[in-house]
Regions:
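Short alpha-helix
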Residues: 132-148
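Conserved Class I S-adenosyl-L-methionine
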Residues: 153-190
């Protein structure tokens, strides 16, 4: 999803500590980077990183907020990124509707997350392990279309994630235990 972002507004939904957002700054600095998360602790880390000499030249705004009720103006964002966040939200349709609302026409939206491989609902899996809230790729596709977001591309990262977990480079055994998929999607707002 790396396109020239000069003079663009980029939003990281579920910024956490900012790993993805700050990597994007290194690749293609935008006019403004906005990070939103419901975790004050993660945002505190992201704010501190944004003040480091490496990033202090960039305009960064970190907001404590609800991803299902974004405090962002309509049609004001050029690019949106989100990693491993959607499956943690109870109202995925509401979050995608908000993404569609704030995205400019033609905005690029990159979302990567874990997905279930079947429609079987979760029973006792915890939300912290990113299992209980996961939906299928088909359900995700339908939700996107219902709010005016179109899938322009997707990459299946399942095998890469499985290898990282098996090699103990990613502490997420539940991913293997529940036979999850991991996908990255490029969405475009109509």
């Amino acid at each position: 999803m790396v396109h020239p972002l000069k003079d663009k507004v980029v939003l990281d939904l579920g910024i956490g500590t900012g790993c993805l957002a700050f990597r994007s700054l290194e690749l293609s600095p935008p006019k403004l980077l906005v990070g939103i998360d419901f975790s004050a602790t993660g945002l505190c880390v992201a704010k501190n990183i944004s003040k480091q000499s490496k990033f202090q030249q960039y305009e960064c705004d970190m907001i404590l907020g609800d991803l299902e009720k974004l405090p962002i103006a309509n049609r004001s964002v050029d690019a949106i990124i989100s990693q491993a966040t959607l499956n943690l939200l109870p109202d995925k349709c509401g979050a995608l509707r908000e993404i569609s609302r704030i995205a400019k026409s033609g905005a690029r939206i990159g979302i990567s997350d874990a997905f279930r491989t079947s429609n079987k609902s979760s029973d006792d899996e915890s939300w912290e392990q990113c299992i209980a809230g996961a939906i299928t790729v088909s359900e995700f596709s339908q939700l996107c279309l219902s709010v005016g977001l179109f899938i322009a591309g997707q990459v299946d990262l399942t095998q890469q994630v499985r290898m990282l977990v098996a090699d103990k480079k990613w502490d997420w055994p539940e991913f293997l235990e529940h036979n999850m998929d991991y996908r990255a999607f490029l969405l475009v707002r109509s």
